[in-house]
Regions:
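N-terminal helix-turn-helix
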Residues: 1-88, 248-256, 271-273
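Amphipathic alpha-helical effector-binding/dimerization core
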Residues: 66-164
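Short, solvent-exposed recognition segments
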Residues: 126-201, 266-273
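Juxtadomain coupling helices with adjacent low-complexity linkers
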Residues: 190, 218-273
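Short hydrophobic beta-strand micro-motif common in sensory/regulatory domains
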Residues: 204-208
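Sensor-regulatory modules in signal-transduction proteins
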Residues: 210-213
Length: 273
């Protein structure tokens, strides 16, 4: 991961420190210094200095020669979410949508060839996937990802699809490029996307775009269901109208928030803290 910078202002030490933080995943929440050095492609002395610096700053902790992240790293991700205003705006709308459908609902944005969850309201159901704010999945395997990819220009789409996933999942079988473009063209035309057990067996979802004040697609909102409980027809005939209405409300409120960047915006719903 290290050594990718070429510009005169690129700070390699900062990039390496971020590489160290990105090494920690759900599958490996605790790692030794040797494991971190290998995962981040760093010399062990370099990894040691970075880890000790991060420990002093409060971003990692060490116990029995193993390192793990601390809750302080949440400040980095939540600063981004808060700066968008998306979570504060979307949460009450997602809660209403969940009450209407009885199913979990989330919002995600594109980061490379992955989606990253930026808002979520879940119902207490056992599902095969653990999803929370910050979770990454390959965009092509998700309804939200398809919506976001469909909104890209041909050039941006080609660059995005060429990027490797950083979701930490096993490689998925490659698809025919023409089939991908055909599906995304359909998504773009009809305004919604479906993922039918592509990410995981038994998981089905439908997603629609969330737009900013200029009409640009900036996020995608979905409803996720158990495939054994809810068929595609129910998703498209019963849940999709609620989803489209909710996304429209969030888009309108987000556009208002963006138009008044230095003002206090009165939301249409109280925001729970």
């Amino acid at each position: 991961m290290a050594g990718r910078g070429t510009g005169p202002d690129f700070v390699e030490a900062l990039a390496r420190g971020l590489d160290v933080l990105r090494c920690f995943e759900a599958e490996r929440p605790t790692m030794t210094m040797t494991e971190i050095a290998a995962a981040a492609d760093l010399a062990r002395p370099t990894a040691r200095r970075l880890l000790l610096t991060l420990e002093e700053l409060g971003y990692v902790r060490v116990a029995k020669n193993s390192f793990s992240l601390t809750p302080r790293v949440l400040q980095l991700g939540m600063a981004y979410v808060s700066s968008l205003g998306l979570w504060q705006i979307a949460r009450p709308h997602l809660e209403t949508l969940v009450r209407q459908t009885g199913e979990s609902s989330s919002m995600a944005q594109l980061d490379g060839s992955d989606i990253v969850y930026v808002a979520r309201v879940a119902v207490p159901k056992i599902i095969a996937l653990r999803v929370e704010i910050g979770t990454r999945f390959p965009a092509l395997l998700t309804s939200q990802g398809k919506v976001l990819l469909a909104a890209l220009s041909p050039g941006d789409l080609a660059v995005t699809l060429a990027e490797p996933s950083r979701a930490g999942l096993p490689p998925f079988l490659p698809r025919d490029p023409q089939a991908i473009h055909d599906e995304l063209r359909t998504v773009r035309a009809r305004g919604w996307a479906l993922a039918n057990e592509e990410l995981a067996p038994g998981i089905r979802s439908i997603a629609v775009p969330v737009r900013d004040g200029e009409g640009t697609v900036r996020a995608a909102m979905n409803v996720t269901v158990h495939a054994a409980e809810t068929d595609v027809e129910t998703l498209t005939t019963q849940y999709l109208p609620h989803l489209l209405r909710t996304a429209s409300d969030v888009s309108a409120e987000w556009a208002l928030w963006q138009s008044r960047p230095h003002a206090e915006v009165t939301l249409s719903h109280p925001v729970a803290i």
